[in-house]
Amino acid sequence: VVTQYISFYRDLYQIDIRNEIDWNEKQVLLRCYFPVDVHTDEATYEIQYGNVKRPTHYNTSWDDARFEVCAHKWIDLSEDGYGLSVLNDCKYGCDIHNGRVGLTMLKSAIFPNPDADKEHHSFTWSLCPHVGRWQENDTVAKAYALNNPYQATRKTNEGGTLPKSYSLVSVDVPNVIIETVKKAEDGEGTIIRMYECWNRRSK
């Protein structure tokens, strides 16, 4: 059973599709395709701490056999002046070919575990059309927001005061992402892991 909840927003160029699936299939691959009117010969796929461009067409039999590739939180297909970013919160097999974007939602292999993934699944992807390039339209930030949504919590006042806004650490350029902040294991310092996400020089 597949149930989808589609959300449109008045002031946000984003369509969220939440999927609720009760999966009991055997040797079935479930994919979703989005037809797109974007003309380009390459697409951009997020990888760990960066992104990579891959062709949107097949040149060799090896390309033809590779029906999908991996990506992390987002993929983007853009032509000059317009594009579409597709965000996801846990599905990493995808492809962009012949004017359509495909995502693998579920598969039910029989080896090594014949009952793998036979359960309830809940996941979301988002369609984000944009003018210009993905770098100028917060694709990376939107993907992080989908994967790490804000969570409100109640806290009793313990006598201190807080400013209206506060951040432990911040950057002043949009193409540098603070990925991890942790306490050092061999001292009193703090370890901050960050990376540049646009393939651009930065200071």
Kindly give the residue locations of the regions a language model identified.
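C-terminal (or distal) subdomains of carbohydrate-active enzymes
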Residues: V1-K203
